[in-house]
Amino acid sequence: MKVLIQRALNACVVVDGETIGAIDHGQLVLVGIEKGDTEVDTQRLADKLLKYRMFGDEDGKMNLNVQQVAGGILLVSQFTLAAETKKGLRPGFSTAAIPEEGERLFNDFVNKVRAQYSKVETGRFGADMKVSFTNDGPVTFMLD
């Protein structure tokens, strides 16, 4: 499981011309589910995401997590994070979870984040989504 978190001034996801999720200041989180991932992974990464200190304190040091700054979280499934890219010039997706398992684990991850924090929005699993955001910093981290 790979979780790409980006500190955002704002972010939104649009499906079929309709905004289905949007946040102001907070985190845009892209989530890739891989074969072999389990609920243990979703719990570990939900906990880490919520506690990850990527926001500046009064001295500008990355010392605060998303909850401490009352930021929003926009969770978006992105199976391409599970791509194999070491060989060739085209990504392979044999390491990505099958869609049914990916959706189940993505929803489990969403539920675990929401159980600990209320300011959570999501995209739509498997949909053709248009994601827009303003990266603050830029600040981007890969959690796995």
UniProtKB/Swiss-Prot annotation:
EC code(s) of this entry: 3.1.1.96
This protein's GO CC annotations: cytoplasm
Reactions accelerated catalytically: glycyl-tRNA(Ala) + H2O = tRNA(Ala) + glycine + H(+); a D-aminoacyl-tRNA + H2O = a tRNA + a D-alpha-amino acid + H(+)
InterPro entries: Daa-tRNA_deacyls_DTD, DTD-like_sf
Keywords annotated in UniProt: Cytoplasm, Hydrolase, RNA-binding, tRNA-binding
Subcellular location: Cytoplasm
Top EC category: hydrolase
Motif Gly-cisPro motif, important for rejection of L-amino acids positions after renumbering to this chain: 137-138
NCBIfam families named in the record: D-aminoacyl-tRNA deacylase
Protein family (similarity comment): Belongs to the DTD family.
Protein name in UniProt: D-aminoacyl-tRNA deacylase
Naturally occurring in which organism (per UniProt): Marinomonas sp. (strain MWYL1)
Gene giving rise to this polypeptide: dtd
